[in-house]
């Protein structure tokens, strides 16, 4: 994103309940008015299968300061989910040359309080070093999934990430951790 434009000024496609574009709005307006838009969630794992977990900075526009087990963000106006997944993964992980994230599934997130977005979930393997954006990430680490599970009751996680994680676990079914990708 252009350094002169704040994240609140980013233009997003506004979509209906079937994920069809019905208009556009500034990101800040979309959140303030509860307009449905698009987001990507990227499940990033290292070669050992550990999950990238991070704590969001207190300056984030939405859900400041909790932890998240996904990297990702909003899909810009006219941008595809696939392109947004790669862009967000590279930006938030601070890693270039990542393989294109693999699309897993899509769901409609709605917290019932005006936060609603179509959410495309992806997975990517991160072979090299990461250097997350200090503006986005206050802490990070690659955790074994069993440790992540243990932290769910101890750390505050973003609600949309928890929803995506529950759906990811259901999507994987009984095959267990590490079965995706």
From Swiss-Prot:
Give one GO term, molecular function aspect. Answer: hydrolase activity, acting on acid anhydrides
InterPro entries from the UniProt entry: NUDIX_hydrolase-like_dom_sf, NUDIX_hydrolase_CS, NUDIX_hydrolase_dom, NUDIX_hydrolase_YfcD_pred
Q: Which cofactor does it need?
A: Mg(2+)
Q: What is its EC number?
A: 3.6.-.-
Residues reported to bind Mg(2+): 88, 92
User: Pfam families of this UniProt entry?
Assistant: NUDIX
Q: Which domain of life is it from?
A: Bacteria
The record's keywords, sorted A to Z, are: Hydrolase, Magnesium, Metal-binding
What stretches pass through the bilayer? none
Record flagged with keyword GTP-binding = no
Q: Which family does it belong to?
A: Belongs to the Nudix hydrolase family.
PANTHER family listed in its UniProt record: ISOPENTENYL-DIPHOSPHATE DELTA-ISOMERASE (PTHR10885:SF0)
Q: What is this protein called?
A: Uncharacterized Nudix hydrolase SCO1686
